[in-house]
Amino acid sequence: MALSAETESHIYRALRTASGAAAHLVALGFTIFVAVLARPGSSLFSWHPVLMSLAFSFLMTEALLVFSPESSLLHSLSRKGRARCHWVLQLLALLCALLGLGLVILHKEQLGKAHLVTRHGQAGLLAVLWAGLQCSGGVGLLYPKLLPRWPLAKLKLYHATSGLVGYLLGSASLLLGMCSLWFTASVTGAAWYLAVLCPVLTSLVIMNQVSNAYLYRKRIQP
């Protein structure tokens, strides 16, 4: 027997709620896992994976889930209030990423090694630069009077698209980091595959949220 449209809608909404809740838990759990693994403070380098996972796994994921209609932790706030919280979380993510990038460059300098020559390093640098541009673009949405010639709807569309690309870049840098000698020397077997699934899962949830809640809606409008 075929399901009614209303039943399908309820099932789909329940699945999105469950996936959003999973994204919250996975983003936090992955960041804690990396922190335990890296033991921040044990060396200069130890702060790099902690800060980068905090930036691209936890803070950035939470910044985007703020707008989720099913799994936002800030439902009680107005749209404007959630937008400001989103910008604050994104700014914190950028600061953590900049600090993490700076510390690993300093670490490489102290060892006399080349830096930003691996795919992980290059992806990380690109993700940090993209995050900086994204935060700058967010100012135009917080204060649209600064860009009077640009329709607000188009600004939101560009910001959403760019933000999704930036998030995927951050996730890619995390995935490449998990292929590094430092990570693979400590995490092997099933644990490694489970760790890899974390940014993959959160990326899928964020892609679904942005596409369905904004990009797809804009595409079907005349």
Curated annotation (Swiss-Prot):
The gene coding this protein: CYB561D2
UniProt function note: Transmembrane reductase that may use ascorbate as an electron donor in the cytoplasm and transfer electrons across endoplasmic reticulum membranes to reduce monodehydro-L-ascorbate radical and iron cations Fe(3+) in the lumen of that compartment.
Q: How does activity depend on pH?
A: Optimum pH is 6-7 for the electron donation reaction to monodehydroascorbate reaction. Optimum pH is around 6.5 for re-reduction reaction process of the oxidized heme with ascorbate.
Protein's organism: Homo sapiens (Human)
Q: Where is the Cytochrome b561 domain?
A: 14-217
Q: Give the UniProt entry's GO cellular component terms.
A: cytoplasmic vesicle membrane; endoplasmic reticulum; endoplasmic reticulum membrane; vesicle
Entry keyword set: Cytoplasmic vesicle, Electron transport, Endoplasmic reticulum, Heme, Iron, Membrane, Metal-binding, Translocase, Transmembrane, Transmembrane helix, Transport
The residues that the entry says bind heme b 2 are 86, 159
Q: Which CDD domains match?
A: Cyt_b561_CYB561D2_like
- Protein name per the record: Transmembrane reductase CYB561D2
Ranges of the Cytoplasmic topological domain = 2-17, 68-85, 144-162, 208-222
Translocase as a keyword of this entry, yes or no, is: yes
What SMART domains does the record point to? B561
How does this protein lie in the membrane?
A: Multi-pass membrane protein
Which residues are exposed on the Lumenal face of the membrane?
39-46, 107-122, 184-186
Q: Which compartments is it annotated to reside in?
A: Endoplasmic reticulum membrane; Cytoplasmic vesicle membrane
May I ask which residue range the UniProt record assigns to the signal sequence? Answer: none
The record's principal subcellular location, in a coarse class, is: endoplasmic reticulum
